Structures are given as C-alpha cells and as structure tokens.
A protein has these predicted regions:
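Single-stranded nucleic acid-binding surfaces, predominantly the OB-fold ssDNA-binding core
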Residues: 1-109
Length: 109
C-alpha cells in the first residue's frame, strides 16, 4: 500500500473563537480567514477569501495563549471530515483542520 499524506499549513486571521476546558487540556474551536491574491484575465487584482474551521488542543506544539479574534496565527495539521444527519434528515459534511502545531504570531513575523 502506498503512503498517504494528509497535511495542511495555514496562516491567517482568527474569526470567532470558542475555548473550553477538556479532560487534561484546553480545546479551542475557531474560524480562520486566509486570503489568496491573483489577477483576472484583464489584469485586475482579485482577493479570494476562504474561511476554515479549526480544532486545536493545547499542549505539545499548540500554544493557545493570545488566541483572540483578529489574531494572526500560523498552524499545521490535518483535515478531518465528519458526516452527520441534520434535523431535517439531510446528510451533511463538516470539514475542519485539526491543528498539530499552532502559534499566535506578532504582527511583524
């Protein structure tokens, strides 16, 4: 069987943050905004914005101190896809990044 890779690296601004105590650790779920700049066929600058769902558990290389709305963060992790059935009976998917490393950056980093 060939080796597979599930790796994500993101740097962007934090949106909403929910921090909650967990057994033996602190967990954070937050949204992260990344932006990609490109040019249209006519040469106009376009900014493509993407919101990501992130789950992080403090410890190891995950540092949650200073994680607030607007913070600039850099993280690496993996994608996790969960399927569930909504109240109306439709099948839904929830995609999130589970952080292995997370650092709140200073503005000049």
């Amino acid at each position: 069987m060939s080796k597979s890779i599930n790796r994500v690296e993101l740097q962007g601004r934090v949106g909403t943050v929910r921090i909650s105590p967990c057994v033996g650790a602190v967990a954070a779920n937050f949204s992260l905004l990344t932006e990609h700049q490109l040019r249209s066929a006519s040469g106009l600058a376009i900014v493509e914005s993407t919101w990501h769902n992130v789950a992080a558990f403090e410890g190891g290389d995950v540092y949650l101190e200073g994680l607030t709305r607007g913070s600039l963060v850099h993280l690496t992790g993996r994608l996790r896809i969960s399927k569930y059935t909504a109240a109306d009976g439709t099948e839904r998917m929830f995609i999130e990044v589970v952080a292995d490393t997370l650092k709140v950056l200073e503005e000049n980093e």
